[in-house]
Amino acid sequence: MATASFNMQSVFAGGLTTRKINTNKLFSAGSFPNLKRNYPVGVRCMAEGGPTNEDSSPAPSTSAAQPLPKSPSPPPPMKPKVSTKFSDLLAFSGPAPERINGRLAMVGFVAALAVELSKGENVLAQISDGGVSWFLGTTAILTLASLVPLFKGISVESKSKGIMTSDAELWNGRFAMLGLVALAFTEFVKGGTLV
């Protein structure tokens, strides 16, 4: 017990600078070509309006050191151009599918609850009583209304200000999708309307 304690104390007592760990013996740079250093080529720099001859040497300055003029700030980075191709907009990772489905779910959830409160019908009864035509019409209108700005190159993030941001719309749409499925499932299990 005492020797184990002494060994542990000797490991922790020595500073990190006293122990050398040589990783070059474990891994040589030749066996890993990506670890070799690439030494950069020398680069010359000239001030604007300065001498252009290579032979000219700067004149010794007799006055105090003057501050160098500030270089102009770099231009802001260019925003990537938004693709307006139909296949890019409706791609799985594109800007349209989740937003369109979320908008449809928000409208559908509110409409399902409104009809349930007014007529007392559950979601499955609403669909069988002519809800399919309402669903198809709403889907066509909201899809076209969502795609028109995207075809013009307007991104969703550019129009989000205040509390109505694009992230809030995404999350509201996700919750509405879950809510609509949960409403239909609950009414199916319960056998009647939720409210």
Curated annotation (Swiss-Prot):
Pfam families: Chloroa_b-bind. Residues 69-79 have a biased composition (Pro residues). Induction: Levels increase linearly with increasing light intensities and correlate with the degree of photoinactivation and photodamage of PSII reaction centers (at protein level). Induced by high-intensity light, at both cold and warm temperatures (e.g. 4 and 22 degrees Celsius) (at protein level); quickly and transiently induced during deetiolation, and accumulates in green seedlings following increases in light intensity. Induced by UV-A, red, far-red and blue lights illumination in a phytochrome A and phytochrome B-dependent manner; this induction is promoted by HY5. It is found in: Plastid, Chloroplast thylakoid membrane. The chain crosses the membrane at residues 104-124, 131-151, 175-195. Disulfide bonds: none annotated. InterPro entries: Chloroa_b-bind (IPR022796). Residues 1-46 form a transit peptide. Residues 56-68 have a biased composition (Low complexity). GO terms for cellular component: chloroplast thylakoid membrane; photosystem I; photosystem II. Keywords: Chloroplast, Membrane, Photosynthesis, Photosystem I, Photosystem II, Plastid, Thylakoid, Transit peptide, Transmembrane, Transmembrane helix. One of its GO terms (biological process) is cellular response to red light. Residues 46-81 are annotated as: Disordered. It comes from the Eukaryota. Disruption phenotype: Reduced greening during deetiolation in continuous high light, with a reduced ratio between chlorophylls a and especially at the highest irradiances. Slight reduction in the rate of chlorophyll accumulation during greening at moderate light intensities, and lower zeaxanthin accumulation in high light conditions. Normal sensitivity to photoinhibition and photooxidation. Impaired seed germination, especially in high light conditions and at warm to hot temperatures (greater than 22 degrees Celsius). Prevents excess accumulation of free chlorophyll by inhibiting the entire chlorophyll biosynthesis pathway (e.g. 5-aminolevulinate synthesis and Mg-protoporphyrin IX chelatase activity), and hence prevent photooxidative stress. Probably involved in the integration of pigments into the mature light-harvesting pigment-protein complexes. Light-harvesting chlorophyll (LHC) a/b-binding protein required to ensure a high rate of chlorophyll accumulation during deetiolation in continuous high light. Involved in seed germination. May fulfill a photoprotective functions. Belongs to the ELIP/psbS family. This is Early light-induced protein 1, chloroplastic. It comes from Arabidopsis thaliana (Mouse-ear cress). The gene is ELIP1.
